[in-house]
């Protein structure tokens, strides 16, 4: 069994919808909802929602790259978001819901940039890919009630996933490309 562990950090709008797709993959050790990229130390959900802290809702993934490589994480990430929307994601608007790939080292940056370029050239989207690739910043875990929300609140999670427009967007852009 591999002992390797790395971190990947992705902002993709509401973090509730960003946990389940990664949580279900082999080689994923942990998926944690939280906040990153801002200037406030240990912000609360209420503070982040004001769009004054500079933080984005994000997930930090601990993974074994020998089982589930970073390139596969990137592919899965792109399939959870609208990478052409710079104002938030689906029904959630504002800075805290903008997308971003937070890289932890140079190799991740190279892979993220190559993946973004490949997606831009794929023709899947009519508009340019605007998701930023940023240096990893301090990551602050969200409050416990946000962690693994899809397991704790299944009905509300499903209603939100569909009602926000995310589920339909994913279906229309990726259903025949996976």
From Swiss-Prot:
The keyword Oxidoreductase applies. It is an enzyme of class 1 (oxidoreductase). It comes from the Bacteria. The keyword NAD does not apply. SUPFAM superfamilies: Peptide methionine sulfoxide reductase. Has an important function as a repair enzyme for proteins that have been inactivated by oxidation. Catalyzes the reversible oxidation-reduction of methionine sulfoxide in proteins to methionine. Belongs to the MsrA Met sulfoxide reductase family. This is Peptide methionine sulfoxide reductase MsrA.
